[in-house]
């Protein structure tokens, strides 16, 4: 379980998160959507300690992350961002195995896990020895997700991971990710600018504006009972 308790964060004189409180239950697929500058990425990066709150606490399984070894914490959390974030000098195999090597996994176990994740993400094993620049955009994103899943994390953070791929590839990645969530039961926190994507993927959807929660509910209830004008305007975009 991830908990934000009375979180505030400012950059200079601009407060981007204001007295923010949220609980994300284990196994939730939470999609976060909102206006630019609404604090989406700030909230995401607070979970793995890349950004520290000015006030309040972030807890994972009842433990304040600031009391934890943050490097070790990040190795336990999968992280996927938009675009090519693979190590350009490493092969597909070595990119996926990166955290496993850091954790000193046995070579045979690494081989087994890499094969499993490649199969899970519909990546041909023939790609193992290729470098990232020899892959399509969709293949690169799949490798990034496979790497995030390699050490079987309980939490996966995704910051607009499908924003740089074409519509057909995006559709297939969305479908694959929904299936992955069912299989792994990991807690996924997923940022998007696309309300249709947010409603399609999330078991819960969080709508933000100016650092404040506008609505947090299951997709069906957000569609049937939008809480305010901001949420209504977002839903109109889904109808276009």
What are these regions (language model features)?
Residues 152:
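Conserved catalytic motifs of ABC-family nucleotide-binding domains
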Residues 64-78, 83, 102, 222-226:
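ABC ATPase NBD coupling module
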């Amino acid at each position: 379980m991830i908990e934000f308790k009375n979180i505030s964060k400012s950059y200079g004189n601009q407060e981007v998160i204001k007295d923010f409180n949220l609980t994300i239950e284990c196994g939730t697929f939470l999609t976060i959507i909102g206006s630019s500058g609404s604090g989406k990425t700030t909230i995401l990066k607070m979970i793995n300690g890349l950004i520290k709150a000015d006030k309040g606490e972030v807890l994972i399984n009842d433990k304040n992350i600031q009391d934890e070894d943050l490097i070790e914490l990040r190795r336990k959390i999968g992280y996927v961002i938009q675009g090519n974030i693979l190590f350009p000098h490493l092969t597909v195999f070595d990119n996926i195995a990166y955290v496993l090597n850091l954790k000193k996994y046995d070579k045979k176990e690494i081989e087994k896990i890499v094969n499993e994740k490649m199969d899970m993400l519909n990546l041909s094993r023939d790609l193992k020895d290729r470098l990232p620049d020899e892959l399509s955009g969709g293949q690169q994103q799949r490798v990034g997700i496979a790497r995030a899943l390699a050490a079987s994390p309980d939490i996966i953070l995704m910051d607009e991971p499908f924003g740089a791929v074409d519509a057909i590839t995006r559709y297939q990645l969305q479908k694959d990710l929904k299936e992955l969530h069912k299989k792994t039961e990991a807690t996924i926190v997923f940022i998007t600018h696309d309300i249709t994507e947010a409603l399609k993927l999330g078991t819960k959807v969080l709508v933000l504006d100016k650092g404040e929660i506008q609505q947090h509910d299951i997709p069906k209830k957000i569609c049937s009972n939008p809480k305010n004008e901001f949420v209504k305007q977002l839903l109109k975009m889904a109808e276009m």
